[in-house]
Amino acid sequence: MNLSLCIASPLLTKSNRPAALSAIHTASTSHGGQTNPTNLIIDTTKERIQKQFKNVEISVSSYDTAWVAMVPSPNSPKSPCFPECLNWLINNQLNDGSWGLVNHTHNHNHPLLKDSLSSTLACIVALKRWNVGEDQINKGLSFIESNLASATEKSQPSPIGFDIIFPGLLEYAKNLDINLLSKQTDFSLMLHKRELEQKRCHSNEMDGYLAYISEGLGNLYDWNMVKKYQMKNGSVFNSPSATAAAFINHQNPGCLNYLNSLLDKFGNAVPTVYPHDLFIRLSMVDTIERLGISHHFRVEIKNVLDETYRCWVERDEQIFMDVVTCALAFRLLRINGYEVSPDPLAEITNELALKDEYAALETYHASHILYQEDLSSGKQILKSADFLKEIISTDSNRLSKLIHKEVENALKFPINTGLERINTRRNIQLYNVDNTRILKTTYHSSNISNTDYLRLAVEDFYTCQSIYREELKGLERWVVENKLDQLKFARQKTAYCYFSVAATLSSPELSDARISWAKNGILTTVVDDFFDIGGTIDELTNLIQCVEKWNVDVDKDCCSEHVRILFLALKDAICWIGDEAFKWQARDVTSHVIQTWLELMNSMLREAIWTRDAYVPTLNEYMENAYVSFALGPIVKPAIYFVGPKLSEEIVESSEYHNLFKLMSTQGRLLNDIHSFKREFKEGKLNAVALHLSNGESGKVEEEVVEEMMMMIKNKRKELMKLIFEENGSIVPRACKDAFWNMCHVLNFFYANDDGFTGNTILDTVKDIIYNPLVLVNENEEQR
């Protein structure tokens, strides 16, 4: 199938592009002979992102600044310790009377009303505490009275601890003779809800949670409970508001030192959490990897991960007192080859932590990289899926719809599975530039999300698409030149074979690896059909003999035109690989590629003879041959000569290398046999399911056998994952190991619903990777 002829490239239709980025891409196709303006834009964008790795930015919090402003001077209790914070409150009230990140003047139904209510009330209390800012207090009270009903609306997203903190602030305001024109019933209802929430926390031993929101406890404040969660920097959970309340209630010098350090760094206003640099930098790495642009920032990413690993080894509180940071650090460190255990994450993961959407989401991501031996200690981590399902079953407000979409995608497309380029496309299209996070109050960080990431990701995606289209055209010409299209018995799957590698080895510099992978994928498909239906035993044997002899006279030594075409195509591909691989490896690998092909064809011949002779092997005998005959060897093994590292003979002959291949191929064979069982059973072909039924325990039915085999696949996958991720004792370079892992993702994709290439929906995905333009969902929603 010539995909490029049957699909007109939609990239030529610029009206389909997102408006904000079409001008950038248009520039890349103009100004011939001059410096490409797009490259200049991209280089500038990359420089800005590189600088962000060094400079972490986080928005200031009016809520936390208000609590710091309430702190009395140790030397003069009737004076504020931080008058500069009071001045900031006076000068930073919004024109609707509120304080916070959102101005509600033109958007009265904005979903952050509860956050604005608690921030505004905290600021009012702080100003009243020191009898300043009467005008600001009155404007703030007017805002609260107009919006107080939102405090009890379930459809409004709640900051962490709102049901305890906001009623606590109301009590504080009442003690300061601040008169809110609210119904007594509403006030009583909130206090009752607060009491129930406090009882629930105490009964479930949620002291850590109560310490984090301790500024809302009022008369129930317990320093003996809170001080257990004081960190080395003097703070309570790195929270300025909780730390300020701790100093107000119990003049702890560590708390004051922390607050002084905050003001030294930030001036007259503070963020809602500090330090937060480690989490933010890890979020940068995660975002950049998800958007498919990590190849631009390898040095910066390595620096972040090295620093994170140092903190992990030293048991830094930034990691181990926060579930989200711990889960994110564990996942990124493990998949990048650092030796880390999930035990610290398991220790801090509890039911309360998983009720937070981001904590449950990150923990769920982490659950997919647990090894087999981790499962017993990681039971709480594995429960995260249940909490995510509960989250998306609840009514979503407008702000939570974005996180709900993330959750739905996480459950449908688990991290560390799926094809990299498909995931990248989905992540780009769903990317939210304005990624507001909610703790006790909302905050933004341009390091976590910004237009530069999106701009670079979109341009990089389109650049790769243009490369893919040219490579696919070249492959289609190669198929015709080698007469493979004339073999009527063979499936023509050029686009599918190329797609499988473009979706995994996507970087522009990996062109040789993609061509090698795709050519051998095309050839293994044709050869498989030849050994299956297209050739006689004599022809199959003759083809093997020609490859063994190598330097043959095709007119004399090939017994048929089919053998002639196949041998010449094989020789052309293998010689090309040998010549190109020499440039990468500085040695001749042709003999290894030939040997890989011979191993495959001999295994296929063995199966053909078994079928001819009606021989039924044992299940073990079948599998020892079938993992080779599944035909992944010629696809993956030659391709890894082109991914970067040099591979010695010692490496390619090592037990580690062989185990990688066997684990990958066994998964593929089992998936294939499960999905093709009914068809192959009717055709009388050998199949692992059929052999399992005939050789296994009596009375077992197909469903039981398939369930056992799926569990075997799952275990093999975890075993392979461990081999891929772990570096201790490994001699196979990580980039090479990743090729085996990528092929597993390819197999899962092709066999998700159908038997290999037969899926009707796969063509649309092929188009998405090679041809179709991106559709930026969030941008389109904003335009509407």
From Swiss-Prot:
Its main location: plastid. It holds the Pfam family Terpene_synth. It is an enzyme of class 4 (lyase). It catalyses: ent-copalyl diphosphate = ent-kaur-16-ene + diphosphate. Residues 1-28 form a transit peptide. Its cofactor is Mg(2+). A motif (DDXXD motif) lies at residues 528-532. Binds 3 Mg(2+) ions per subunit. Accumulates in leaves. Pathway: Plant hormone biosynthesis; gibberellin biosynthesis; Secondary metabolite biosynthesis; terpenoid biosynthesis. Keywords: Chloroplast, Lyase, Magnesium, Metal-binding, Plastid, Transit peptide. CDD domains: Terpene_cyclase_plant_C1 (cd00684). GO terms for biological process: ent-kaurene biosynthetic process; gibberellin biosynthetic process; terpenoid biosynthetic process. Mg(2+) 2 binds at residues 528, 532. GO terms for cellular component: chloroplast. Its EC number is 4.2.3.19. GO terms for molecular function: ent-kaurene synthase activity; magnesium ion binding. It is found in: Plastid, Chloroplast. PANTHER family: ENT-COPALYL DIPHOSPHATE SYNTHASE, CHLOROPLASTIC, ENT-KAUR-16-ENE SYNTHASE, CHLOROPLASTIC. Involved in the biosynthesis of ent-kaurene diterpenoids natural products such as oridonin, miltiradiene, eriocalyxin B and nezukol, known to exhibit antitumor, anti-inflammatory and antibacterial activities, and in the production of gibberellins phytohormones. Catalyzes the conversion of ent-copalyl diphosphate (ent-CPP) to ent-kaurene. The Asp-Asp-Xaa-Xaa-Asp/Glu (DDXXD/E) motif is important for the catalytic activity, presumably through binding to Mg(2+). Belongs to the terpene synthase family. This is Ent-kaurene synthase 2, chloroplastic. The lineage of its organism: Eukaryota, Viridiplantae, Streptophyta, Embryophyta, Tracheophyta. The gene is KS22-1.
